[in-house]
């Protein structure tokens, strides 16, 4: 059924890639709660990107492309489920979202495994941002807007967070002190959530920062 939902989008000759909806984890598990919140956010973003022009990347668990548009990747490429769809978009085709096609992954990795996965994704984000900077061309229209807001800003966000932390420590104003307290609460919650997960404890409100 999911495959039928995917391929129906290819009746539009402008569509070169279709991504399905990805659902992950046990909602009763701490990691699943945090991941569920993250994927709900990602789903909203992808819906809007698809309406604007094209989504950035695809869910590796379930997506389809036109065979004629595939371009081989190098051995050093990370996150092929992002690069393959983006190269199709580069060729002038759309990459769209099909929420009626659903892929479920019920098991969530350990905290250590999840951290390793996200570290790999972050490394891929850096690689892809550099490799696809040409997508920022104004000639790309909505794709350029999506690429800047969804990929470039996300890649450099850790640098902004470090700069914010440093400026909050050295800033003499009440606003800087308030920002420092909020950051300490956020990072502290993530650390406590990590420790709770290692001990097998579930604390729902700690799932988001983790």
PLM features: residue spans?
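Short alpha-helix within the catalytic core of nucleotide-sugar-dependent glycosyltransferases
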Residues: 1-11
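Catalytic donor/gating beta->alpha subdomain of glycosyltransferases that bind UDP-sugars
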Residues: 10-41, 76-80, 84-150, 208
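Loop-to-transmembrane-helix entry motif
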Residues: 48, 52, 151, 155-159
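Conserved nucleotide-sugar donor-binding
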Residues: 57-72, 93
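Short, well-ordered alpha-helical scaffold segment located
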Residues: 68-70, 102, 152
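Membrane-embedded multi-pass helical conduit in multi-pass membrane proteins
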Residues: 105, 154-210
């Amino acid at each position: 059924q999911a495959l039928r939902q995917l391929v129906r989008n290819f009746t539009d000759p402008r569509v070169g890639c279709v991504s399905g909806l990805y659902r992950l984890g046990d909602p009763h598990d701490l990691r699943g709660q945090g991941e569920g919140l993250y994927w709900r956010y990602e789903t909203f973003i992808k819906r809007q990107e698809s309406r604007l022009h094209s989504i950035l990347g695809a869910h590796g668990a379930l997506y389809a492309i036109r065979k004629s548009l595939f371009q081989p990747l190098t051995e050093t490429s990370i996150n092929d489920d992002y690069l393959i769809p983006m190269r199709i978009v580069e060729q002038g085709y759309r990459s769209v979202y099909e929420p009626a096609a659903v892929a479920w992954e019920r098991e969530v990795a350990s905290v250590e495994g999840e951290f390793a996965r996200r570290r790999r994704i972050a490394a891929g984000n850096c690689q892809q941002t550099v490799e696809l900077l040409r997508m920022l061309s104004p000639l790309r229209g909505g794709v350029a807007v999506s690429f800047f807001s969804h990929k470039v800003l996300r890649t450099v966000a850790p640098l902004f967070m470090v700069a914010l932390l440093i400026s909050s420590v050295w800033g003499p104003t009440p606003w800087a002190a308030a920002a420092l307290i909020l950051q300490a609460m956020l990072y502290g919650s993530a650390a406590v959530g990590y420790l709770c997960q290692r001990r097998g404890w579930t604390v729902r409100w700690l799932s988001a920062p983790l």
